[in-house]
From Swiss-Prot:
SUPFAM superfamilies in alphabetical order: Nucleotidylyl transferase (SSF52374), Ribosomal protein L25-like (SSF50715)
UniProt keyword list: Aminoacyl-tRNA synthetase, ATP-binding, Cytoplasm, Ligase, Nucleotide-binding, Protein biosynthesis
Binding site for L-glutamine: D67, Y212
Lineage, uppermost ranks: Bacteria, Pseudomonadati, Pseudomonadota, Gammaproteobacteria, Enterobacterales
Residues reported to bind ATP: 35-37, 41-47, 231, 261-262, 269-271
Oligomer status and interactors: Monomer.
GO biological process: glutaminyl-tRNA aminoacylation; glutamyl-tRNA aminoacylation
EC number: 6.1.1.18
Name of the featured protein: Glutamine--tRNA ligase
Catalytic activity: tRNA(Gln) + L-glutamine + ATP = L-glutaminyl-tRNA(Gln) + AMP + diphosphate
CDD domains according to UniProt: GlnRS_core
Subcellular location(s) per record: Cytoplasm
Length: 556
């Protein structure tokens, strides 16, 4: 089954099906309109998957349009990163990239049309006064004293705004709708404000910039969008969307439909809060692998396929709900279980000397790159008299449930020999530094000849032919499921969201490309870090563990 065939139906697809069946539309045209003031996150991925996926499935078009109406917060850095993220996720936009700034001249003309119709006026209340005059949900607003200016005066003042004759915040253009409306968005919303800032597309041509609600609907209409898909927080804004299009001379009137935004547990989606994490250096940047940004997830080792599958599974509804982080982790775990080659790495190493092997002993052992995919081939892994195992895989004493190496007992080394721990060596602090063992020479990749059962299997690397590596063990950035609900979201940070360990990895792995995934056996899924990895200093990021340990912790 293809990815498109696997997509579940939803209320938006039902609307589209009905529109096509009735002849209301003969084709489908959607758009993804991010503001270039930050990096895309997993919530945007849901919108990308919905808008581009619908266009693909209905053989329609999807525009990438940058809602670039606030030059103070926007930057080409974000434009470039958004384009990269969309394409990395597996989608391509129709035709050229669009910018809301492409339509600044037309938007200005439509603003003049509203002024000429007596439906817009220049207001000189201060921003604080405008907020006060707007009222509250329980108290109606009151009219601005500037509301009833003549068309001629409003035209002249609007021209003065454009010519830079007003200071920022001293004047704005507002729609004349209804200050007593039960919907706050309809209480004479601001259409244009003054900002003396160069724009990344238009330079210094403009010092007045249109607001989102005025720009968005007109841009949709100019591009021939048939289905304008927004998240639920824009539900009330639909009234303004329709009001603007109903009151200007334009031939196309798209319809806006709202769906629930993605609320992912143990994460935040607020750009302001994410920016605070970056500026306060709580994380090392927007691509920190603990961030919910697409660039952060990519650097951590998430694949585009796993993110698309996550978006498919959570579906599209009109009800806000919280999605468990485990659902996202399950998607990458399943994807990497199928595609990631296996390798061995020891993250918390302790030295093992197999005394029954001769000094200088080495042997190459053939190991499958994937237990269920023989077409992925095999690799040669060096085995030697001295190896490293994980410190957690040895105890001097243990109960019967412990199936690893115990003093005086046996364990199997993965794809190698059965060994038995004889004695240990410790440092002055009592820390074990070396475990001395003997091996059964007849057990190389096979069971003991006498029929005895050796239940435990542990991984290892050669001490002589492995390479020192850094392992970054990433976990959830927050320790509470809903950090945004906390009075101070920073108080919910998980102190163990990053643990750095120094260990060893089998010799062939450091030749990996950055971002290339591996399953380090018994440890989890890792990838070569795109920022710090080099063949002489390999750095690996843990993408996800082999199982959901958070669920286990919650059950305790």
């Amino acid at each position: 089954m293809s990815e498109a065939e696997a997509r579940p139906t939803n209320f938006i697809r039902q609307i589209i099906d009905d529109d096509l069946a009735s002849g209301k539309h003969t084709s489908v045209h959607t758009r993804f309109p991010p503001e270039p003031n930050g990096y895309l996150h997993i919530g945007h991925a849901k919108s990308i998957y919905l808008n581009f996926g619908i266009a693909q499935d209905y053989q329609g078009q999807c525009n990438l349009r940058f809602d670039d109406t606030n030059p103070v917060k926007e930057d080409m850095e974000y434009v470039d990163s958004i384009k990269h993220d969309v394409q990395w996720l597996g989608f391509n936009w129709s035709g050229d990239i669009h910018y809301s700034s492409d339509y600044f001249d037309k938007l200005h003309d439509y603003a003049l049309e509203l002024i000429d119709k007596g439906l817009a006026y220049v207001d000189q209340l201060s921003p604080d006064q405008i907020r006060d005059y707007r009222g509250t949900l329980t108290r109606p607003g009151k009219n601005s004293p500037y509301r009833d200016r003549s068309v001629e005066e409003n035209r002249a003042l609007f021209a003065s705004m454009r010519q830079g004759e007003f200071a920022e915040g001293s004047a704005c253009l507002r729609a004349k709708i209804d200050m007593a409306s039960p919907f706050m968005v309809m209480r004479d919303p601001v259409l244009y404000r003054i900002k003396f800032a160069d724009h990344h597309q238009t330079g210094s041509k403009w010092c007045i910039y249109p607001m989102y609600d005025f720009t968005h609907c007109i841009s949709d209409a100019l591009e021939g969008i048939t289905h304008s898909l927004c998240t639920l927080e824009f539900q009330d804004n639909r009234r303004l969307y329709d009001w603007v299009l109903d009151n200007i001379t334009i031939n196309v009137h798209p319809r806006q439909y709202e769906f629930s935004r993605l609320n992912l547990e143990y994460a935040i989606m607020s750009k302001r809060k994410l920016n605070l994490l970056v500026t306060e250096k709580i994380v090392e940047g927007w691509d920190d692998p603990r961030m919910p940004t697409i660039s952060g997830l990519r650097r951590r080792g998430y694949t585009a396929a796993s993110i698309r599958e996550f978006c498919r599974r959570i579906g599209v509804t009109k009800q806000d709900n919280n999605v468990e982080m485990a659902a996202l982790e399950a998607c990458i775990r399943e994807d990497l279980n199928d595609r990631a080659p296996r390798a061995m790495a020891v993250i918390d190493p302790v030295r093992v000397v197999i005394e029954s092997l001769p000094m200088g002993y080495e042997q190459d052992i053939a190991m499958p790159n994937h237990p269920n995919r023989p077409e992925m081939g095999t690799r040669q892994v060096a085995f030697s008299r001295e190896i490293y195992i994980d410190r957690a895989d040895f105890r001097e004493e243990a109960n019967k449930q412990y199936k690893r190496l115990v003093l005086g007992k046996e364990v199997r080394l993965r794809n190698a020999f059965v060994i038995k721990a004889e004695h240990v060596e410790k440092d002055p602090q009592g820390q074990i530094t070396t475990i001395f063992c003997r091996h059964d020479p007849d057990t190389l990749s096979k069971d003991p000849a006498d029929g005895r059962k050796v239940k435990g299997v542990i991984h290892w690397v050669s001490a002589n032919r492995s390479l020192a590596a850094e392992f970054r063990l990433y976990d959830r950035l927050f320790s509470e499921a809903n950090p945004a609900a906390a009075e101070d979201f920073l108080s919910t940070l998980n102190p163990d969201s990053l643990v750095i360990r120094q260990g060893f990895v089998e010799a062939g792995v450091p030749a990996a490309n950055t971002g290339e995934p591996f399953q380090f056996e018994r440890e989890g899924y890792f990838c070569a870090d795109s920022r710090y990895f080099s063949p002489t200093h390999p750095v690996f990021n843990r993408t996800v563990g082999l199982r959901d340990t958070w669920a286990q912790r919650a059950a305790m």
